Amino acid sequence: MTTHALAHDSQPPGLPATRKQQDYTEDRRRYWDEFSRESTGWQPLRTFYQKRLAEIYRFLIPPGMRVLELGCSRGDLLAAVKPAYGVGIDLSPAMIAAAKSLYPELHFIEGDAHSIDLGAQFDYIICSDLVNDVWDVETLLKNLARHCSPSTRVLLNTYSRVWELPRRLAEKLGLVKKTLTQNWLMTSDVENLLYLANFELIRVGREILWPVPTPLVGTFFNKFVVKLWPFDLLALTSVLVARPLP
């Protein structure tokens, strides 16, 4: 587990990035640029995972909303929730280029989620698999406030620490793409960081127990078994919903 996102002093949005943060961000920009160009044997696993996430987010976000996604990748999740006005932010130029090509009806901007300021508010803000990957989770969450109204809902999903070792094993076996250093955060960690950023956690759902694309079995485990104790403790990801504190 890396602790950089929790250990160093959080810097207010808008301040210049430190050299370490710049290097960290550049490493990720290169990684995701490369990721956007690859199509290898592990793609079916990722496609299955992303499809299930899209189902979950469609359940939580009604169509026709104003939606902002930070770390939007190719824009697939943003498009899946069918926003009336959708904006995606990503630090990877290659990802943004792909998103613009795939979904010309949406708006995509290359930028850093720690400091982006769009001068607009949204009904929903999505941070999917983002807090695991960013330099400073607290700064990221504090920066969301400028895009929130009192009724805005922030939706995050984050990998469970239970899956850290299985993930490393899958990487060694070539089943998934090797990741850069991650923030393996517990739900309680994210809740505390949300509170520090002036957000209140209002919903937690544990999702995806069977991340392998197998007919019927995947549906059974991921829609039913994962909701039952103690199997929910083994879920791959947690989906959290938060709102601004008054």
Q: Which residues are covered by each model-predicted region?
A:
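Conserved class I S-adenosyl-L-methionine
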Residues: 2-62, 64-73, 155-177, 215
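Class I SAM-dependent methyltransferase SAM/SAH-binding core
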Residues: 73-114
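A short glycine-rich, Lys/Arg-flanked "PGG" loop and its adjoining helix->strand segment in the class I
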Residues: 138-153
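Acceptor-substrate binding/catalytic loop of class I
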Residues: 172-189
